[in-house]
Structures are given as structure tokens and as C-alpha cells.
């Protein structure tokens, strides 16, 4: 299996001057995504509120791949700001702008400025399932034990 795949990316006009997503270390799994809101109009994220942040990017993923939009741990740990629908899924056939749905779980307002790294994008292979209807499922030691059944 190859260590890299080619992913076509296009910057929209409102992302002009911003860096393309990039890995921040040699073994990073995610490419950092930047906010592409206007420099004249920072987004204010009040506690308990959410906002769709533009990235100004569109991508063309190869067939059988997806991109997952995930939180940046520093924003969550320091400010309580995270990706609301984590992980957000970008399908291989989607060609629209990548948006990041951020929510503020913190106690203070959070300002999102143009160019700020707001999320990370992980490219991952997809295995498609063929669902087979059955009358019964095979038995397991766990059985129907659900939430909390394997311990605290």
C-alpha cells in the first residue's frame, strides 16, 4: 500500500493568500484547515453557539476515499471549541466548499480570525458494506449488553 495518494484541491477566491492545508509534523495524521472568513469580519462564537466556518477549499478525493473533518485538540483543551459534527465526512463525490461546523462549549466568547487553524482533515480509505438481511445473528459472549455493560 502506498503511503500517499493524490488529492486535487482548489482554492476559491475568498481563500486567496491563505496556505493550503498542511501536515504540521512528520507523522501527523491530519492536515490543518484554516478559516477563510473576511479579515474585516472575524466570527464571534458565543458560549453555547455554533457557526459554519468557510475554508475556501474544494477537493476531489479518489474513489473509495473520504476526508474526515476533526477537531484540533488545542482549541478544545484551551477554549472548549470543537467540531460539532465530529468527524464531519466529505465524500469522494462532493465538490462543494469544505465548511467546518464549530461549537463553543467554553465559558467565554471565542473569535475566529481569517487564517486561523480551526480543524484538521484526515484522508481515509472507505470500505463499502453489503448488508445481508437475516432472521438471527450469531451469539457472542457480550450478547445484547449495551451502554456501560463492559465496565465503567
UniProtKB/Swiss-Prot annotation:
The answer to whether keyword Magnesium applies is yes
Catalytic activity field: dUTP + H2O = dUMP + diphosphate + H(+)
Query: Where does the sequence pass through the membrane?
Result: none
Pfam families cross-referenced by the UniProt entry: dUTPase
| Residues annotated as binding substrate | 72-74, 85, 89-91
For whether the record's keyword set contains 4Fe-4S, the answer is no
- Domain of life (superkingdom): Bacteria
Pathway in which the depicted protein is active = Pyrimidine metabolism; dUMP biosynthesis; dUMP from dCTP (dUTP route): step 2/2
Kindly list the GO molecular function terms attached to this UniProt entry: dUTP diphosphatase activity; magnesium ion binding
| GO aspect biological process, one term | dUTP catabolic process
Which InterPro entries does this UniProt record tie to the protein? Answer: dUTPase, dUTPase-like, dUTPase-like_sf, dUTPase_trimeric
Q: Name its co-factor(s).
A: Mg(2+)
Keywords in alphabetical order: Hydrolase, Magnesium, Metal-binding, Nucleotide metabolism
Query: Which Enzyme Commission number(s) are on file for it?
Result: 3.6.1.23
The entry assigns this protein to a family as follows:
Belongs to the dUTPase family.
HAMAP family noted in UniProt: dUTPase_bact
Its biological purpose is as follows:
This enzyme is involved in nucleotide metabolism: it produces dUMP, the immediate precursor of thymidine nucleotides and it decreases the intracellular concentration of dUTP so that uracil cannot be incorporated into DNA.
What's the protein name? Deoxyuridine 5'-triphosphate nucleotidohydrolase
Organism lineage reads as:
Bacteria, Pseudomonadati, Pseudomonadota, Alphaproteobacteria, Hyphomicrobiales
Amino acid at each position: 500500500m502506498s503511503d500517499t495518494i493524490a488529492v486535487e484541491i482548489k482554492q476559491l477566491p475568498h481563500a486567496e493568500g491563505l496556505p493550503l492545508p498542511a501536515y504540521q509534523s512528520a507523522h501527523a495524521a491530519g492536515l490543518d484547515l484554516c478559516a477563510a472568513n473576511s479579515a474585516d469580519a472575524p466570527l464571534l462564537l458565543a458560549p453555547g453557539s455554533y457557526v459554519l466556518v468557510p475554508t475556501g477549499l474544494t477537493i476531489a478525493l479518489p474513489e473509495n476515499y473520504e476526508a474526515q473533518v476533526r477537531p484540533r485538540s488545542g482549541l478544545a483543551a484551551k477554549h472548549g471549541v470543537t467540531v460539532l459534527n465530529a468527524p464531519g465526512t466529505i465524500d469522494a463525490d462532493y465538490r462543494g466548499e469544505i465548511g467546518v461546523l464549530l461549537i463553543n462549549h467554553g465559558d467565554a466568547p471565542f473569535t475566529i480570525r481569517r487564517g486561523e487553524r480551526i480543524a484538521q482533515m484526515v484522508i481515509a480509505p472507505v470500505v463499502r458494506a453489503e448488508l445481508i438481511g437475516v432472521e438471527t445473528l450469531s451469539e457472542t459472549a457480550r450478547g445484547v449488553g449495551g451502554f456501560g455493560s463492559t465496565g465503567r
